[in-house]
Each structure stands twice: as structure tokens, then as C-alpha cells.
Amino acid sequence: MVVILAIVEGITEFLPISSTGHMILVNKLIGGEYLSPTFRNSFLIIIQLGAIFSVVVYFWKDISPFVKTKKEFVLKFRLWLKIIVGVLPAMVIGLLLDDIIDKYFLDNVLIVAITLIAYGVIFIGIEVVYKLKNIKPKVKRFAGLKYRTAFLIGFFQCLAMIPGTSRSGATIIGALLLGLSRPLAAEFSFYLAIPTMFGATALKLFKNGLAFTEMEWSYLALGSAIAFVVAYIVIKWFMDFIKKRSFASFGLYRIILGIIVIVLLY
């Protein structure tokens, strides 16, 4: 079960199709009764640690604070400042609503199905409107990304607290609506994931880490390692994909999966 969930996490974490939604669905389908409820719910979040490190490794050249010139330092400083501004909404709202989300939404498969379909429709709708009206992106480079825009994208990220939404999906939708190009929207979504997901993982470890058994810690280590390798491969593929194609195919996938979930489970 741990290996399967780790592979699913690695594949889905940075695609706009909801990793948590897929993890909940897989967890429902393959069981996992031998794991404690507290650990199962925490595992779905903490296993993201491996995927986060894949982002750091893949984009290290772009985000590394170790630079040689003053110009590079200024560019990196501004980039990280925009990332920090972008994660502020999720930090505040996440801390306030974490327990409520865990209690009422985290294990609700119907909500996962509904959000999969809803955001699938939104993705297709955005792409159709952009094509029909021939809308061109206003921001293609990070230098043109304003702090206000980064902050607003951060609010879209908060929507991903509802399982099935997709953190990357919500931030990419927000970025597209605010004028960013597809590649820039995806890249900024990856950057926002670093502090956001580190924070979510740290929060779960702080709340439940002392209750984990030695075996459960080994599950977390194995799952994170597998998620790292798979996620790295997926990031490389995804960044190449969106340079040539739209997000409509991901929207269609979400709708089909959401319908299948409703049919099979209800």
C-alpha cells in the first residue's frame, strides 16, 4: 500500500489533477486497515516531503540563494520575496482551518469527486475562452510578476485545502486568470509548493509525529523516497508538455475521473 500511494503521490502531486484526491481514492480502494487512522491521514500529507525535494533539486539553479554577482542576488531576492508573499494566505488560512478540514473534508470521497469535476470544467472553460478570444498572456517572466499578483495567486492556493481541488491546479488557474503564461504559471506553482508543503508537513509532524511507531516512520521514509524519484520525472515531463499544449486535457481527465468515482462509489 505504501509503495502504491508513494507512486500515486509522485505522479499526481504537481499535475493539476489533485494528488490528495487521488491518494484518498486509492486509500479507499486498496484498504490500509493495518495503519492507524491518525497515521493514514498524516501519511497523505507528510509523504509530500519527497515530492517537495524533487522541486528543489529540479529548479535548484533558478532558486538557489548561492550566487556570484550582485545582480543575481537581487533577482533571487525578489523571486523569493514574491514566493513568500504568495504563501502568506495559505499560511494564515491553513493554520486556522487545518483541524476543520481534517475533520469534515479529508476523507470525504464525494467532495473529492465534485471538486475534480468542477475544476476540470474551469480548466476547459479557461482554455476555450482564451482560444476563442485569442487572449495572450501579459506576464511571461518573473521580472514582470508583481507582488500584488503573487499575493492574489496565494489566495487561489488556499482553495486546495479542499481535497480534490489540486494545489497546483488552483494556483495555475489563478495565475492564468491574472495574466501569466502557462509555463510561468506552472513554474510559480512549483515554487509556491516549497514553503507551503514544507509547512503542511511540519504541522502534521508537530501534531502527530510523537504518536508514530518505528514501523510507521519507516513507511514515511520509504514513501517519501519513492515520491521524490517519481515526482522528479513527472516535473520534467510536465514542463515540456505545457510549452506545447494547453491544460484542457487535464480538465477532461478530472471530469472523467470525477464521474467514475461517483458511479463506482455511489
UniProtKB/Swiss-Prot annotation:
UniProt protein name? Undecaprenyl-diphosphatase
Record family assignment = Belongs to the UppP family.
Subcellular location, record wording: Cell inner membrane
Keywords, A to Z, come to: Antibiotic resistance, Cell inner membrane, Cell membrane, Cell shape, Cell wall biogenesis/degradation, Hydrolase, Membrane, Peptidoglycan synthesis, Transmembrane, Transmembrane helix
Protein function? Catalyzes the dephosphorylation of undecaprenyl diphosphate (UPP). Confers resistance to bacitracin.
Sequence intervals crossing the membrane = 1-21, 43-63, 81-101, 109-129, 159-179, 183-203, 219-239, 246-266
Enzyme class name:
hydrolase
Additional notes on this entry: Bacitracin is thought to be involved in the inhibition of peptidoglycan synthesis by sequestering undecaprenyl diphosphate, thereby reducing the pool of lipid carrier available.
Task: Report the catalytic activity.
Answer: di-trans,octa-cis-undecaprenyl diphosphate + H2O = di-trans,octa-cis-undecaprenyl phosphate + phosphate + H(+)
Q: Where does this protein chiefly localize?
A: membrane
Give me the Gene Ontology terms describing cellular component. plasma membrane
Entry-linked Pfam families: BacA
Superkingdom of origin: Bacteria
Extract one GO molecular function annotation from the record. undecaprenyl-diphosphatase activity
EC number(s) on record?
A: 3.6.1.27
